[in-house]
Amino acid sequence: MGLEKTVKEKLSFEGVGIHTGEYSKLIIHPEKEGTGIRFFKNGVYIPARHEFVVHTNHSTDLGFKGQRIKTVEHILSVLHLLEITNVTIEVIGNEIPILDGSGWEFYEAIRKNILNQNREIDYFVVEEPIIVEDEGRLIKAEPSDTLEVTYEGEFKNFLGRQKFTFVEGNEEEIVLARTFCFDWEIEHIKKVGLGKGGSLKNTLVLGKDKVYNPEGLRYENEPVRHKVFDLIGDLYLLGSPVKGKFYSFRGGHSLNVKLVKELAKKQKLTRDLPHLPSVQAL
C-alpha cells in the first residue's frame, strides 16, 4: 500500500469563488502523521469528513461552529488522487477558488511538493457491495484492491449518453476536466443565489448543440470526466484514501454524499474525530 503524505511547504492559491463570486485565498499547511485533512477558517477547524457536510446543491460545502466553506470537492479530489493525508487547508474567504474550473493548478503544485511520512495509510476499503438511488440516479460501490470510478451520464443535448472510467495511475485524465453547466440551467442557478463567479474562464458552458467556450471541449467526454473527478473528491469525506470500485449513473454531490454516509454507517466507521462528541451542522 502507501505511506501517509503531507506537503513539503506551504502552498497558496487564490481567485474567485464560482458560487459566491467573491475573492478567496487558500493556504495548504504541512501537518504531522495522523492529523488527517482539515480546513481552517476564522479560528475554527473543520475536518474534511461527511459529518460536517451542510450543503450539496451544485457543490459540496462543509460547516462547523458557525463557519462554512463552499465548494470543497475539487481540492479534496486532488488530495485524494495524490493520497495526501495530512494537511490543514486555511481558507481566507467563504469558498475554495474555482481557478480554471478543473483541478489542474492544485494538482501540479501539490504533486511537485509531496513529502512521504513514516506511517502507513489506513485506507477505507469497501467490504461489500452497496447501492444508493434517488429518482433515476444511482451509485454502486463494490470491493476492489484499487480505486476505480466509472461515471455514466445521459445529457439532453449533443453529448447524449457518455461514459468514462478512471483507474489509479491515470490521474491526469481527469484533473484537466472542467466544471460545466448547460445554458438552460443558468437562470435557475443565478435565481437561487449561486454561480455568481461563473464565467467562460472557469466553467464549460454547453447548449443544445454548441459549446460556448471559444476553445471548445478539452475532451469529447469532458463532462463525465469531471463528474468522476467530483465523485473522487466527495469520497474523500470518508476520512481516508479509498479502495473500491464505483459506478455512478447520473449521480451528483447529494447522491455522492448519501453513498459516503451509507458506507460509513454500514462499515461502522468510528475513527477518532478531532472534535467533541456532538457534531452540529449549520
Swiss-Prot record:
Domain of life, source organism: Bacteria
Consequence recorded when altering residue 226 to A: 720-fold decrease in activity. 16.6-fold decrease in zinc content
Outcome following mutation: residue 100 to A/N/S: Almost no change in activity
Effect of residue 234 to N: 29-fold decrease in activity
Protein name: UDP-3-O-acyl-N-acetylglucosamine deacetylase
Species per Swiss-Prot/TrEMBL record: Aquifex aeolicus (strain VF5)
Effect of residue 19 to Q: 2-fold decrease in activity
GO CC term, one of those recorded: membrane
Outcome reported for the amino acid change (mutating residue 19 to Y): 22-fold decrease in activity
